[in-house]
Regions:
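Flexible, compositionally biased loop and terminal segments
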Residues: 1-215
Length: 215
């Protein structure tokens, strides 16, 4: 089987709230569980030699959610950013951390923490992990300097949560991406799910507008 190159995988981490609702839990419980899955996802990507992993965690449109949920998501992101466990994990795994987003409405405390983690992991080069937080693709394209310009084209976009849209994610980089709409809610995403998604990707015939030669 011919294998497509897999340099950049992007994910829209969707379904946390609905996952929690099915268990009669508050939405923030789903976000807590979903955050735990990210560490495992990083290992899956490393094992498959992915060089860029980009995760959509909070969009500009997400400010329209209930204030308590928005506040919790920002607090959760900050806690993960400043955690020594996070830094140790990134250094051990040789991961370069990047943030993709707009500074609007974000606290100085959070922005300073992001900048520090980026600085401490800047020399790592096995995997570039980009967290898109407070980001919008259209706003990015409309800005004077495209803030996502450091990212290469996406090979595979996976959206969990049984929703079939790209929700204003990195529009420029998604131009020729293969897209998989995964039914699994994000907190239930496992290594088996990842392997199924990657297998499906490698079965695709990527043409980039051309006609593939006959064998």
């Amino acid at each position: 089987m011919r294998r497509n190159s897999l340099n950049h995988v992007a994910l829209i981490l969707d379904g946390n709230g609905r996952w929690a609702k099915k268990r009669h839990q508050p939405r923030i419980f789903g976000h807590q569980q979903g955050a735990k899955v990210i560490k495992h996802l990083i290992d899956y990507a490393l094992n498959d030699y992915v060089k860029y992993l980009t995760l959509f965690c909070f969009s500009l449109e997400n400010w329209n959610r209930p204030q308590a949920e928005v506040k919790f998501l920002h607090s959760l992101f900050y806690q993960k950013i400043v955690s020594k466990k996070t830094l140790d994990f990134f250094l051990k795994k040789n991961i370069c951390f990047k943030w993709l987003g707009f500074k609007t409405k974000l606290s100085k405390k959070l922005l300073d923490a992001i900048k520090l983690l980026e600085k401490k992991t800047a020399k790592n080069n096995k995997l570039t992990l980009t967290i898109a937080f407070n980001y919008g693709g259209r706003q990015d394209l409309d800005s004077k300097k495209r803030i996502s310009s450091f990212l290469p084209n996406v090979d595979l976009l996976i959206r969990t949560g049984n929703e079939n849209r790209i929700s204003n994610f990195i529009l420029y980089q998604l131009a020729y991406a293969e897209i998989i709409f995964e039914k699994t809610f994000w907190p239930d995403y496992t290594k088996k799910t990842w392997k199924q998604n990657i297998k499906e990707y490698h079965l695709r015939k990527r043409r980039f507008g051309a006609i593939l030669p006959k064998k």
